[in-house]
Amino acid sequence: MKIAIDAMGGDHAPKAVVLGAMKAIKEYSDLHITLVGKEEEIRQYLTSEERITILHTDEKIESTDEPVRAVRRKKQASMVLAAQQVKDGVADACISAGSTGALMAAGLFVVGRMEGIERPALSPTMPTVDGEGFVMLDVGANVDAKPIHLYQYAVMGSVYAEKVRGIKNPRVGLLNVGTEGGKGNELSKQVFAMLKDAPINFVGNVESRDLLQGVADVVVCDGFTGNVALKSLEGTALALFSMLKEQLMSSFTSKLAAAVLKPKLMVLKDKMDYSEYGGAALFGLKAPVIKAHGSSNDQSIFSAIRQTREMVAKEVIPTISSVMEKEPLQ
C-alpha cells in the first residue's frame, strides 16, 4: 500500500509530517510513503528512509492563495503532485494538512469525483464523552446543498463508520433544530423523508446540544450548518479548558487540587483530542483524500495515515461506489 503525503502542508511542516510518517512506517509493515516537497527540508528530520520516498518540488500552495486558481496554476505544488500520484495510480491515497479549499479543488480536478456522486463532502470524526466519536458530514465542502446531496452523505458516512470505525449498523442522524420529524426548514424535511427509506440505520433528527453525548455515529448536514456546528464545538471546548485552567491556577489551594486531579484531567483531554481521530475525509472522490488538521503535530499525522490506511485496506471507496450504483435516487 502506498500513500502520498504533502510534506509542506500545515503549520508544523515538514517536521510534523516527516516524524508522523516515520512513526507510521514503524507501525505498519505493508506501508510505503511518498513525501512530496522540498527534499532538503524533509531530510533535516528524516532519520530513516525505509519504505519512504521523497518526490522533490520547490513549489507549494500558500494559505493566502486562491484555492482553485492555485491548483490550476501551480501544477508542481506539493499538494497537487500528491494528488497526481493518486490519479496516476502510483499511490492509493493522499494526505495534506494544507489549505482545505485547495485540497478540495485538487481532489475534484486531479483525483476526480466518483461516478454518481453530485457533491463531495468534508467529514471529520468528532469526539464524544464516551470516547467513541462520531462522523460528521458535510462541514464545509458545500455550503448550499440539495436533498440528494445529504442523502448521499448519509450513505457514504454509514459505509465509512462501518468499514473504518468498525461500528456495526451505525446510527445515522440528521442535524436539525428539533428531534421531531416535522422540524426544520424545507431541506431538512425533504431529507428526513428520504432517509427514512434509505438502506441505513436512520435514527431521525438530532440536535447540536446532544452531539457530544454520542446520539449518533454519523451526523448529516449541509456544509454551512456543519461548519458552524464544528467551530462552535471547537470554540466551546477551548473556552471551557481555558476557564478551568484559570480557576485551577487562581490560588495555592486550587493548585494543590489541580495536582491531584491532573491524571483525570489528562484522560479528559485525550478524549477530546482531535489528533487521535485522524483527519477529515473528502468523501465522493475516486480515491481516499484526507485533510489533516492545519495545526497537526506528528501524532495527528500518524493518526491521519492510520485512518487513510484503513480506508484503503477496507475498500471504502469501492464499497461506496457499489452501494451508490444500487441506489434508485441516482
UniProtKB/Swiss-Prot annotation:
Instruction: Output the GO biological process annotations, alphabetical, semicolon-separated.
Output: fatty acid biosynthetic process; phospholipid biosynthetic process
InterPro entries linked: FA_synthesis (IPR003664), Phospholipid_synth_PlsX-like (IPR012281)
Catalytic activity as recorded in UniProt: a fatty acyl-[ACP] + phosphate = an acyl phosphate + holo-[ACP]
Main localization category: cytoplasm
Q: Which UniProt keywords apply?
A: Cytoplasm, Lipid biosynthesis, Lipid metabolism, Phospholipid biosynthesis, Phospholipid metabolism, Transferase
Which residue ranges traverse the bilayer? Answer: none
Where does the record say this protein resides? Cytoplasm
Drop me one GO molecular function for this one: phosphate:acyl-[acyl carrier protein] acyltransferase activity
Its family? Belongs to the PlsX family.
What HAMAP family does its record include? PlsX
The function of this protein is: Catalyzes the reversible formation of acyl-phosphate (acyl-PO(4)) from acyl-[acyl-carrier-protein] (acyl-ACP). This enzyme utilizes acyl-ACP as fatty acyl donor, but not acyl-CoA.
Q: Assembly state and interactors?
A: Homodimer. Probably interacts with PlsY.
Q: Extract the PANTHER family matched here.
A: FATTY ACID/PHOSPHOLIPID SYNTHESIS PROTEIN PLSX (PTHR30100), PHOSPHATE ACYLTRANSFERASE (PTHR30100:SF1)
| Protein name per UniProt | Phosphate acyltransferase
What species does this protein belong to? Bacillus anthracis
Designated gene of the protein: plsX
